[in-house]
Amino acid sequence: MHIGSSLALFWGAILLGYAARRARFVTLTFAPQMTRWLATWVAPPVALLAMWANEFTRLPVISLPFIGLAVSCASLAPAWWLMRRWRLSKPRAGSWLLSAFFSNVGFLGALVAFAVWGERAYGLCTLYFLFFGLGVYTVGYGIGDRYGASVPVESPGARQLELWRWTPMVGTLAGVALSWRGVPRPVVLTAINHALIPLMTAAYLFIVGTTMHMSRVGRFWREGLWMSAIMLVYAPLVGAALGAWWGYRHLPDPLVWRVVLLESAMPTAIT
């Protein structure tokens, strides 16, 4: 899989989903039901196999999720300043802050890494965005509680349970454990995961397309330009600085450093 085909898959799946919604081929319940099914049955084994293909014996590699979390938290600073300057109302303020915190490290970042550098890079990206699930149920819900409904709809304990039920967290940790113990991965699983990764990504992106409303994009051109500056200029500088400080540039395997640079330069998430 090459970079051109990965980008074609990315946009093609989104546009197909958007066309399906416009043609009313899917119902309102399709997106949440399909997302839950993929997160329960497909994402965990894909994460397990991708993580199993890597070597997690060095501390700097294990620290990747913390670098991802630090980059996302740092992106909140300029977003917060602009939110106060523009005096955004509560719902818009919450959406703005969440857009700054969550970047497209999964659907786009991991797919590009897989296309350019292979399955090991995909596994490192999976480790990098391990913070994503934790961020949803901590920072994400925290922003939602403050700028959305006045009363939280779930307790912190219930949210943590959802984290383990509906994300590839278990598969990720199982793959790290197998790699750490030095258990050899059967060769046949490589071909299986090489097929599952683009198929799963395409399915997720199709779901995203069924929830998009293109007519609303032009109304927020100012926010879009500033968010692009945060995600594509400011965040990569933060990621490069943190990665260099943590010693990624001097690791024998340059793939870790490349993954940090790639993932910190991703646009805002689209889910």
Which sequence ranges carry the predicted segments?
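Alpha-helical transmembrane segments of multi-pass small-molecule/ion transporters
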Residues: 1-271
